[in-house]
A protein has these predicted regions:
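NAD(P)-dependent aldehyde/semialdehyde dehydrogenase
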Residues: 7-113
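Conserved C-terminal structural/oligomerization subdomain of aldehyde/semialdehyde dehydrogenase
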Residues: 68-210
Length: 210
């Protein structure tokens, strides 16, 4: 639940995000009928409690009566901040920066395996590096969310974010129990399998094992 951005494009990216939020929801998102609300009062209070006013660069306003919280960007976030300690499930985007791809990769892999990873880059080598060497449940390159919008691709996590996948055929396979059965004929039962285990039996077995 965070944005990890190259420090060289940090300012430009935040400017574009702010512009796009205003384009989609207007100057006052809380008054926009198309802008959703938090599911209940308890969750609203939890999400609002994750907002550090000193780090808000966009949004930050909440309206308890309608259970709405503005799209909120927190900049200058550190790994120790409260917003980085749990899944957010709300309209808050913590922003952190990196100076090298090694630093970015280490930052992600040093934390619990994410359910999803979204890689934004025009460089195919960068795309492949993070797809192949960073563990995560699933994701997209230069897009978000769409990997779970199709029944032809499994959706699921790894480690702390869950095990197994579902959607489409993956759901059937994940939630089905496959029984392993050996069905042996009764007309033959090789005595070789049973005691006493003479030395010649050991030699015979080793011939096939090695």
């Amino acid at each position: 639940d965070y944005l990890l951005v190259d420090v060289r494009v940090h300012d430009e990216l935040l400017g574009l995000i702010k512009e796009e939020v205003r384009h989609m929801f207007g100057e006052y998102p809380l008054d926009n009928e198309d802008y959703g609300h938090i599911v209940n009062a308890k969750h609203f209070a939890r999400v609002r409690g994750l907002i550090d006013p000193d780090k808000v660069v966009l949004g930050g306003t909440a309206r308890e009566a309608s259970l709405k919280i503005e799209p909120t960007i927190l900049d200058g976030v550190t790994p120790d901040d409260a917003v980085m300690q749990e899944e957010i499930f709300g309209p808050i985007l913590p922003v952190l920066t990196f100076e090298s791809l090694d630093e970015a990769e280490a930052f992600i892999t040093d934390r619990p395996t994410p359910l999803a990873l979204y890689i934004f880059s025009q460089d195919r080598a960068v795309q492949q590096r993070f797809v192949h060497y960073v563990p995560f449940g699933g994701g997209c390159v230069n897009d978000t969310i769409m990997h779970l919008a199709t029944s032809h691709m499994g959706f699921g996590g790894m480690g702390a974010s869950g095990m197994g996948q579902y959607h489409g055929r993956e759901s059937f396979d994940t939630f089905s129990h496959k029984k392993s059965i050996v069905n042996k004929a009764t007309w033959l039962d090789v005595p070789f399998r049973y005691a006493p285990y003479a030395s010649w039996k050991h030699k015979f077995v080793r011939m096939f094992v090695h």
